Amino acid sequence: MPSDWDDDEGMPEMRPERPARRRGPSRGQIMRRRLVALGSIVVVVVAVIIVLSSSGGDDGSGRPTAHPSQAKKVAHKTKAKKAASGKVTNATPQADWVPHRGPVPILEYHDLGSPPEGEPYPELFVGRDDFAKQMDWLEERGYEAVTLEQVQEAWYHGGKLPPKPIVLSFDDGYRPQFTFALPTLKEHGWAGVLNLKAEGSDLYESNVKAMIAAGWELAAHTIHHLDLTELGPEEVEEEVAGSRKILQREYDVPVDNFCYPSGQFDEAVVKAVEEAGYTGATTEISGFAERGKPFELARLEILRETHVGGLAADLKNEEGETAEGGG
């Protein structure tokens, strides 16, 4: 026994052996593995191409077309994306917009929902389901909502509009125009025109600002919503010019269009509107708005009993008359 061992300590501690190093694959093995992996990727890509090409049709142009069910899914996703973004897609001209100098339909809405008991004008309350269905119907038929300012830019300054433009106007400033019309139009990527009376509306200042931020146009509807044809010259000027000044001061945006309360106007009222600096004015004359009548712009009033069928008939009738008249 070696002399340096100690009986009390026993045998000296032995260090564990290190595991043996594994020998790495050779260069040839590495190359073979890479080739196998590459081959697998190619097979997967080819399979995906075959599946995609077989799922679509052909529209005669050599481009695959989506199955109808796929098209609906894409449309639904696009609509949801517009709503989530909160952005208005028609705020600026799109690639398919074209010069337009012909008539344009302007729809006229008031309140949305069920009329309260004792309401003197229940016909002005369009059901919310009806309103949503009308917006869906318009989009399905290719209509795109724009503001009146955009129409005037196309009419008088060489601007462009969608192939089937339409203006959605909302009078007076009812609360559901903010709580329901605003989000509904957002789903379609559209904006409306708010014809706001300067005093006495149901909308808060923050509501109006939110609508403007979403791309809506702000138009004047007098201060107190009075019949202008029954007022004297000074009162007319106060209601017409004064409402524009109030709205521009409160919301810091251009207010270039006017809406006659209850559609009432005469030569003196029209003159006051022109002198106040407005570009145009909407009426309750039934029909399409025409470029040659900037201060007598016709509209299609949508009432509680209009529904989708009535809207479709109104648009079809007016389009037919426009075509017959050489539009």
Locate the predicted segments by residue:
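Non-cysteine beta-strand/loop elements that form the S-adenosyl-L-methionine
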Residues: 107, 216-221
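Short beta-strand and adjacent tight-turn residues that come in two discontinuous sequence segments
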Residues: 195, 221, 281-283
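Terminal targeting segments of Actinobacterial cell-envelope proteins
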Residues: 1-33
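A short, conserved beta-to-alpha structural element at the edge of catalytic cores
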Residues: 189-209
